[in-house]
């Protein structure tokens, strides 16, 4: 069978008005091998497609193309069950229902949104399992080692206030002073009349802190990745990213129009092979990794990544959202941790919302690149400047980190202590190492949500992380550690978690 023909033409109608199953399966195989760059011998046609190491955006893109090609939608309830290629082929080749579809009534047009239907299917499953929604709970007060909800104090492991600065008195004082001087908002793009002296000070301090020539601050971390990556790359370029890369970076990559390929998590041999195959066909190549992976709590091999980017003449961009203020003896991030000059990383991206007690994002790098972004990046020039309050909070937080590096060491000790206690209790913490993120892997999505609810009732605030953010069967409770946690907090959390994990058989989805 001519695979190119299969790839580009509509499926052939089969008996009963459906599509030939063999053609549908071959089309799905071609999408996962061609569009996603997965070797054919890696495809187990009976395994869940979410187990191929692709991010959720890539999977959604492939399935959308399959729907367009087959001329029919995939049932959201099937997607919720994490289907295999074979199950998808059976579904798309089955004869359509004999019942003619009813015209959508006014106000019911949202039924055409597959994502909305899948979302609603998830909540139906939650209701059927008798589980309370663990998300969007309301809290009061600062996010410290403890937090208050409805008048009840809980030990808090659901906030990435790594260095305990979000409620620091000096940070709050700096915020008040900035609002008194500059107001609540700069009320304009910085390109026009929104620039304030404090913006330049923060960018200078940030650049010095991470070891770059210059830095540029955006209003949000997600928007930073989307805008910068989407702006720098184009259809002539190649973007390769770790399969666990954050949604913001993957979204920016997709919006750029570049050829986008994921490589298996932290597999530098696979990255090398991918670049060997693809690099020559593109004007430039961008490699995207995270300094600390927020789902796993593990690190990339920076030295090997630098070697590969030199070998293949590629750019290297590191998202330091969870590594700035965490890695390195003084919290300067992944370059300090690996003793690699920061200049070896072409684009250092980070957020202000975690260790730096604020809200916003930044990129740092060569002066020439940052100046170009300052004048041309849409997410910067067409957005209001970061608020004076957030600017002042981040600026004062960096000054405190520089003056008190012991906070970084306190975080490191707490994370190592928690990991050691968890392992001693028989809990599965996956690949977590050297970071402030320690997952406890518990199995099915429903198990993770049930455990989160039970721990909340017992006085521990920890959020579940479920598919498609993680592989099916590897849902987890994600513990964010802080320099403020005490040994008592850590011991209590591990004991209560282990008691509940081992109190019943693992639940399914």
What positions do the PLM features span?
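N-terminal "arm"/small-domain region of PLP-dependent enzymes with the aminotransferase-like
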Residues: 114-184, 314
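Conserved PLP-anchoring active-site segment centered on the Schiff-base-forming lysine
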Residues: 228-247
């Amino acid at each position: 069978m001519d695979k190119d023909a299969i790839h580009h033409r509509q499926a052939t109608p089969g008996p009963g008005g459906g599509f030939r199953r063999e053609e549908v399966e071959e089309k799905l195989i071609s999408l996962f091998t061609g569009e996603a760059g997965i070797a054919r011998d890696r495809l187990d046609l009976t395994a869940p497609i979410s187990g191929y190491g692709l991010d959720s955006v890539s999977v959604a893109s492939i399935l959308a193309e399959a729907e367009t090609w087959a001329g029919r939608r995939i049932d959201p309830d099937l997607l919720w069950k994490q289907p295999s290629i074979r199950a998808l082929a059976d579904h798309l080749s089955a004869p359509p229902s004999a019942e003619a579809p009813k015209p959508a009534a006014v106000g019911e047009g949202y039924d055409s949104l597959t994502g909305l239907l899948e979302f609603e299917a998830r909540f139906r499953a939650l209701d059927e399992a008798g589980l309370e929604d663990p998300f969007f709970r309301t809290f009061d007060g600062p996010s410290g080692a403890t937090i208050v909800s409805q008048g009840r104090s809980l030990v808090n492991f659901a906030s990435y206030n790594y260095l305990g600065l979000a409620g620091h008195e000096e940070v709050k004082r700096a915020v008040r002073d900035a609002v008194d001087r500059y107001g609540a908002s700069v009320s304009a793009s910085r390109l026009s009349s929104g620039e304030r002296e404090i913006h330049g000070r923060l960018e200078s301090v940030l650049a010095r802190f991470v070891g770059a020539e210059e830095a540029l601050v955006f209003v949000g971390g997600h928007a930073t990745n989307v805008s910068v990556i989407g702006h720098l790359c184009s259809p002539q370029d190649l973007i390769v990213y770790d399969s666990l890369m954050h949604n913001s970076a993957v979204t920016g990559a997709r919006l750029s129009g570049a050829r986008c390929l994921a490589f298996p998590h932290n597999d530098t041999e696979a990255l090398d092979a991918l670049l060997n195959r693809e690099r020559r066909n593109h004007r430039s190549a961008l490699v995207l990794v995270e300094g600390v992976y927020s789902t796993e709590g593990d690190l990339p091999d920076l030295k090997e990544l630098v070697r590969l980017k030199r070998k293949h003449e590629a750019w290297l961009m590191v998202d330091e959202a969870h590594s700035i203020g965490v890695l390195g003896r003084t919290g300067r991030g992944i370059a300090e941790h690996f003793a690699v000059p920061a200049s070896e990383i072409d684009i250092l991206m980070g957020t202000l919302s975690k260790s730096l007690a604020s809200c916003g994002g930044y990129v740092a790098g060569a002066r020439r690149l940052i100046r170009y972004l300052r004048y041309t990046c849409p997410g910067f020039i067409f957005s209001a400047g970061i608020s004076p309050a957030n600017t002042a909070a981040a600026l004062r937080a960096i000054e405190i980190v520089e003056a008190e590096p012991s906070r970084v060491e306190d975080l490191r000790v707490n994370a190592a202590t928690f990991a050691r206690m968890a392992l001693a209790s028989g809990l599965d913490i996956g690949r977590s190492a050297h970071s402030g993120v320690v997952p406890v892997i518990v199995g099915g999505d429903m198990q993770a949500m049930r455990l989160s609810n039970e721990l909340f009732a017992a006085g521990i605030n920890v959020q579940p992380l479920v598919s498609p953010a993680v592989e099916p069967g590897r849902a987890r409770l994600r513990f964010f550690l802080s320099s403020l946690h005490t040994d008592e907090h850590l011991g209590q959390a591990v004991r209560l978690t282990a008691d509940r994990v081992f109190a019943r058989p693992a639940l399914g989805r």
